[in-house]
Amino acid sequence: MADSRDPASDQMKLWKEQRAAQKPDVLTTGGGNPIGDKLNVMTAGPRGPLLVQDVVFTDEMAHFDRERIPERVVHAKGAGAFGYFEVTHDITKYSKAKVFEHIGKRTPIAVRFSTVAGESGSADTVRDPRGFAVKFYTEDGNWDLVGNNTPIFFIRDAILFPSFIHSQKRNPQTHLKDPDMVWDFWSLRPESLHQVSFLFSDRGIPDGHRHMNGYGSHTFKLVNAAGEAVYCKFHYKTDQGIKNLSVEDAARLSHEDPDYGLRDLFNAIATGNYPSWTFYIQVMTFSQAETFPFNPFDLTKIWPHQDYPLIPVGKLVLNRNPVNYFAEVEQMAFDPSNMPPGIEPSPDKMLQGRLFAYPDTHRHRLGPNYLQIPVNCPFRARVANYQRDGPMCMLDNQGGAPNYYPNSFSAPEQQRCVLEHSSQCSPDVQRFNSANEDNVTQVRTFYLKVLGEEERKRLCENIAGHLKDAQLFIQKKAVKNFSDVHPDYGARIQALLDKYNAEKPKNAIHTFMQHGSHLAAREKANL
């Protein structure tokens, strides 16, 4: 039985086999000093107290006390892998980025898949958006495409992000997941309807990480060598085919194998079944953006493919598992502001907010020198700047080079040729309310044209099955929003909720007391 286990289960066995006849390494302290006894503490006599001079114990325990680093506030549960991106189609007319330089070019990549709301020990099979972040190690520095498995998101204004995440996390008093919090926020922000509908559809629970698409989601800007710019969106579609889990299978796996997605990815790569995705872009000119029927930078909407077709670019291939999870996955940090020349941000409000939030959280979680950690290091570019010192400075701190700019001593110089693309911006400065920017048209298309009848049925069942645990006034607000999308959408959900709500008194838990004779009649009636 043990001989037929999968590579993930046999990791220790395989590690030993790889060492072949090598002798075991000499056991040492963190400082490299050999250890003579690792099984017994040093004491004054067999029953005496420990000695402070037992540096073997203190070295071990002091490090153990500091093993954990802060958990990611979102996307805490994840799996990672490494591979390459290969260009298959020329898009240099759109972008001068070296990653797209010529057909056949390969760029090393690191990828992290994740759920959003759960903690690091949560199940892989919950209904939740999936993170799908790609780090390209280019000659012009890292490019971090920090995407999801959906082309849209719940909100379009970055100031709402902390509250949105709080609503998906645990109640501050009970420390329980709270349907009131979840649905209260969603019902008060109807721009969430598109993503909520996607989330509760069949694609809300992907079958592992290999069978789902990825999307940059945001609108970006591409700039070519002539300084001409267009807006774009990034898509990466699975070559393994879309597969999703049923509600029943997902629930079963959450108990039987909560690490189902991580295990599936590891074993596929370990057995040479390398997963891949075909990489595409959509392109919109500036003039098209000006006449577009809605805000092209709205993260709650897509660009219709019939108007802005997918343009093939290349392939993402994953062919190496992490050597060590903590070193290469837990410490992996993605930052949307890492963009090499040829790729720039658009005015997308959510993207603009992430440009600050992501590097800020990495500095908190990993330290100000997190880009010196090997998995985050832009190893194909030479880093030269005026940043110095700080906790965990692990490199040479740029030696004796000047640490101020400008200077007269041949230190790193700015390069005018990589200046960002200029753009016009002269509107009034104020806080613009975007809450009611057509929250239903694309959701209606998704409900009526993208989904089939059986898919619509399951969508409504999934929504009602979750919404039923929220208070009635919240249910009413949510149903109103779904009805605004289409009367049939709201009516189906309401009909299912009516059944659930009718069953609630029957399923209520009653507490009975054996000795109630001393209670008043009113108190007895309340038992």
Curated annotation (Swiss-Prot):
Chain ranges for the short sequence motif Microbody targeting signal as given in the UniProt record: 524-527
UniProt keyword list: Acetylation, Disease variant, Heme, Hydrogen peroxide, Iron, Metal-binding, Mitogen, NADP, Oxidoreductase, Peroxidase, Peroxisome, Phosphoprotein
InterPro entries named in the record: Catalase, Catalase_3, Catalase_AS, Catalase_clade1/3, Catalase_core, Catalase_haem_BS, Catalase_immune_responsive, Catalase_sf
Residues engaged in binding NADP(+): H194, S201, R203, N213, K237, W303, H305
PTM sites of type N6-succinyllysine: K13, K221, K449, K480
Catalytic reaction(s) noted: 2 H2O2 = O2 + 2 H2O
SMART domains: Catalase (SM01060)
Subcellular location as annotated: Peroxisome matrix
Name of the protein in its database record: Catalase
Gene name of this polypeptide: CAT
